[in-house]
């Protein structure tokens, strides 16, 4: 099994598990050992899945403004958790490939493996929900057909992205590419860099 086959299997498992209750407040029940990469992958997709549905809820035109503000702050915290987790996954890869002899002509990639895996997790969610739309009995035939066409593109994208990630990991493992990870350094959640939080008028 390739690494992305492993990822996609776990992501689909998460999405199925979440939709047993389909409730953003459902506690996570991560079945994988806490120290394993599978645990991190499961948690990553769980965060993405909950946030996906929070984003749906906050777009309700009749939402109470107080509830909307609370949701916005919850989404901000979720985004920070997501970023932190991506960096943990990159740390796993840096440790895994720390002994690799990097070739003199090795190149750097535009994004780290974990940020590509982040996109793969979100793509699994898009596929699940687009499939729902393509099969909606209460929607028009035109709607279902349009969504089926989009689903076909998403499935093709999943194949291509999975292959690209596996090739990137192979290139890193063989020294043809090297990892260099830059922390996200988000400013809006930091009381020392957000002017509103540190009191700048």
What are these regions (language model features)?
Residues 1-201:
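Anionic, Ser/Thr-rich low-complexity intrinsically disordered regions
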């Amino acid at each position: 099994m390739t690494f992305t086959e492993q990822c996609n299997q776990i992501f689909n498992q998460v999405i199925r598990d979440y939709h047993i209750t389909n409730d953003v407040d459902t506690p996570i029940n991560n079945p994988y050992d806490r120290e394993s990469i599978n645990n991190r992958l499961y948690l990553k997709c769980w965060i993405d899945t909950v946030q996906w549905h929070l984003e749906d809820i906050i777009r309700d035109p009749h939402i109470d403004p107080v509830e909307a503000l609370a949701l916005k702050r919850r989404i901000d915290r979720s985004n920070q958790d997501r970023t932190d987790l991506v960096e943990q996954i990159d740390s796993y890869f840096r440790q895994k490939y720390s002994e690799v002899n990097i070739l003199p002509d090795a190149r750097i990639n535009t994004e780290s493996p974990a940020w590509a895996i982040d996109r793969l997790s979100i793509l699994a969610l898009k596929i699940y929900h687009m499939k729902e739309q393509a099969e909606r009995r209460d929607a028009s035939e035109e709607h279902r057909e349009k969504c089926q066409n989009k689903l076909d593109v998403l499935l093709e994208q999943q194949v291509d992205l999975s292959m690209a990630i596996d090739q990137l990991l192979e290139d890193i493992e063989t020294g043809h590419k090297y990892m260099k990870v830059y922390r996200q350094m988000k400013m809006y959640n930091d009381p020392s860099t957000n002017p509103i939080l540190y009191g700048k008028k």
